[in-house]
Amino acid sequence: WIRLAHWLVMVSFPILFFTLVTGYAQIFSPDWALPLIGHFPPWEWLVEFIALASTIAIIGLIVVRSVNTAHGRKSRFTGSTRWQARFVEATIVAVVGCVDLLRVAESAWLSAAQHEQSASWVHFPIFGWLGRPLGQGANPDTLANVIAVLALVKILCSMTWFVIVGLQPSMGVAWHRFLAFITIYARKHDDGTSALGPLEPMIVDGKPLTVDLLDELEESDAEPNFGVSRIEQFHWKALADFSACTECGRCQDLCPAWNTGKPLSPKLFTLALRDHHAAVAPFIAAAQQLGVEPEEVSDEQLAQRPVHLGVRDGLSVNTSLGLAENSAHTQDILGALLEAKAAPSETGVATKPAPLVGEVIGEAALWACTTCGACVDQCPVDIEHIDRVIDLRRNQVLMESAFPKELGQMFRKLESKGNPWGLPPRKRLEWAKGLEFDVPVVGVDVEDASEVDYLFWVGCAGAYEDRAKKTTRAVAELLHIAGVSFAVLGDGESCTGDPARRAGNEILFQTLAAQNVETLNEVGAKRIVV
């Protein structure tokens, strides 16, 4: 029912906007209506249904948020800006409430003015049952004034909302009403599924990185940039994603890193980048050039401020995670994400262009992501969190050589042994020992893959990891029982490069992927079981 309630509130925005247009005229003339459709019964029925349904829906959503807004990691609203959500909810309640009351008042006014036919259920199917009795014997002039006042209140609430939202470019809970259409339309898949899918290619000099492009770059004297180190290097879809975040916390609720106490929340990761982007946006810089300078905050003043999320639920995340008491970025960005070095502002946002990793997003948070994709799968506005994490990792690995030492060991093992554990290739067939049938190997038992129905790609885990070996054996047995001929590459198989790509080493991934493509072409593989 929550999805239905949210859908009703969403639909109320474009439909009830026309009642806002009507309200401007109703201040002066209570019987004014939109040309052509204003007194068209189906339109009036739609307005009344949407107004009443969205009123019930928003009240229900407020109750859900209030119940789920617990303190600590258990709440998906931890870190969300509470006052912004309450402001948006209050505005919706006020506007749709005014529409409800206006329909009652209009029905009462028509009844008082002896326009019984216009006040009938044909035009007021829901609110007329309350309005018509109220209009009996009432003064039409008084009811006309009531209509004017309600219309004015509706206009003031709506315009106040537009002004405040316009002044708060980082108010995602409001801006998603405009940007969600863009982020959903521009997602990776056009078949209606979520944005979860293959990682975006790394763009270098306007081209997707490939082995051929790497060869060109080696011959060139230019120094290309890999990945993203500053906010302006993100493409427009990424920036739209940041501003479209609704702060609903569904990504945070299912994040394994967050739920196991790691210093990462996909929601707060997005909000950190959003707030930094808003703080260093070109229009802010233009205002500074005109003499509008942000407030200067000294280290002493900053140290005297309470360390918590400020307006975001009052939770001291730094304290709860055992971090330093006086971290610079604590109000708009989760303190656990940050080891602040850039110039902080009163709100805790880095207000000057700065490297993102270490100054907007903490290194521990960046490497805590498992790239499982639960955040992307759950996001209602199709924000692509994983791609943004990998963008930052690519820069750290390929430009800064800044990554956990365990990854360095894995990279070397992938390069030398073709698997993340550094095990010898000759052990890739150990999973087949003990089977009641022989597993043919391409180049040994069969000349090439064209002699069998399928090439069975075992993979590193399926070949080396004890639990995965059971799955590999089961698949092979099923193929054998079904009478499907298959073969494997044995020690000719190498890692797909997926671990390297998830870790940000796109160059190593492209190298391994190209090797595998070459191998598959050589053996003539047409149909592959993975």
Task: Identify the function of each model-found stretch.
Residues W1-E219, N225-V228, K267, L271, ...:
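Membrane-embedded alpha-helical bundles of multi-pass integral membrane proteins
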Residues W161, T246-G249:
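Segments forming glycine/polar-rich beta-alpha architectures that bind adenosine-containing cofactors
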Residues W1-G60, V67, Q233-F242, L264-L268, ...:
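Iron-sulfur-cluster electron-transfer modules
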Residues A105, A144-K154, I164-L167, F234, ...:
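Generic recognition of flexible, low-complexity loop/linker segments
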Residues N259-P263:
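Short, basic interhelical loop/turn and adjoining N-cap
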Residues C248, D253-W258, D377, D382:
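Membrane-proximal, solvent-exposed terminal domains/tails of membrane-associated proteins
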